[in-house]
């Protein structure tokens, strides 16, 4: 639970259906409570409140129910590309056209096309030079850095970058 992890909480948003009454009483920040039966997920409600920030970090958004994990990934892929999903073992972010730097915080690094694109990787075990990656391909699964930092260049399209420390 985020409430036990010591993160500073500025606002709590959602239906709180998975939170015990005891834990709910521990929330000391402003609360925006929504009905359980609604058209949005709790994550979507929270992201909408923060949509103007450059980067939004969603902690714990990949734990628990797989349907909610997939929904959170899809929110990052298609609606709010400034969202980074992160937990103690992995991080998922969107890389659009441009040059991006990745450090060696994570051992396994994969790239999945959100739309067909062109990808270059340097400083990686499996480098690429302007490789066209089609939407159905998994060719760029499980790479790793050979240096302290790797350079990712997206010339076309956009990619989901999955970084993990799982074995």
Question: Where are each of the predicted segments found?
Answer:
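Short beta-strand segments
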Residues: 59-61, 86, 112
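A short acidic, often aromatic-flanked loop/helix-cap motif at beta-alpha or helix-coil junctions
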Residues: 37-41, 91-93, 134
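Residues that form or immediately flank small-molecule/cofactor binding pockets and catalytic motifs
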Residues: 36, 88-90, 116
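Long, charged alpha-helical interface segments
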Residues: 95-167
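Class I SAM-dependent methyltransferase SAM-binding "motif I" and its flanking Rossmann-like core
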Residues: 72-73, 77-104
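N-terminal start-of-chain detector that recognizes signal peptides
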Residues: 55-57, 82-85, 91, 122-126, ...
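Acidic/Gly/His-enriched mid-domain segments of enzyme catalytic cores or analogous surface patches
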Residues: 1-81
């Amino acid at each position: 639970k985020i409430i036990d992890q010591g993160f500073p909480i500025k606002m709590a948003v959602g239906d709180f259906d998975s939170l015990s009454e005891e834990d709910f009483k521990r929330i000391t920040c402003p609360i925006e409570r929504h009905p359980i039966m609604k058209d949005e997920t709790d994550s979507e409600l929270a992201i909408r409140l923060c949509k103007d920030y450059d980067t939004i970090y969603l902690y714990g958004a990949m734990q628990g129910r797989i349907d909610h994990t997939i929904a959170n990934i899809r929110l990052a892929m298609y609606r709010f590309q400034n969202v980074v999903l992160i937990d103690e073992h992995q991080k998922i972010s969107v890389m659009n056209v441009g040059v991006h730097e990745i450090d060696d915080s994570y051992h396994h690094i994969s790239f999945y096309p959100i739309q067909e694109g062109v990808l270059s990787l340097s400083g990686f075990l499996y480098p690429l030079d302007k490789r066209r990656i089609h939407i159905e391909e998994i060719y760029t699964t499980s790479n790793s850095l050979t240096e302290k930092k790797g350079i990712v260049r997206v010339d076309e399209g956009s990619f989901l970058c999955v970084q993990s420390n799982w074995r």
